[in-house]
Amino acid sequence: METNQSNHYKNKRSKREEFISKYCNGDGIIVDGFIVDKGHPKGAEVHSITENGIIIVHNYSSGKLVTKLLARPHQIMRYYKATGREYPPELEHILELARLHNILGYNEI
């Protein structure tokens, strides 16, 4: 677990962190990333997609871990659409994992 965490992550996400560790084989290796600016008061974020279908969100300015998400397929595809990039076919297994996580309700943990 990272030590540079936001208060939100420290206080609200320990259950999800344990779940990811136990049932998703951990975070996995980051395979792609996107800068996302939703107008949050603390600024833009970096959303990193991992080989295990996890989206790791860090604050762009501070580098603090904000949250980890068990991705849904449309979340992943939205990043590519927003940047005008094609989804790399070699990463199709990540979409399959995201579909499975969605069916199993993992994204609600």
Give the ranges of each region predicted by the language model.
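Ribonuclease/tRNase effector modules and their secretory precursors
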Residues: M1-I109
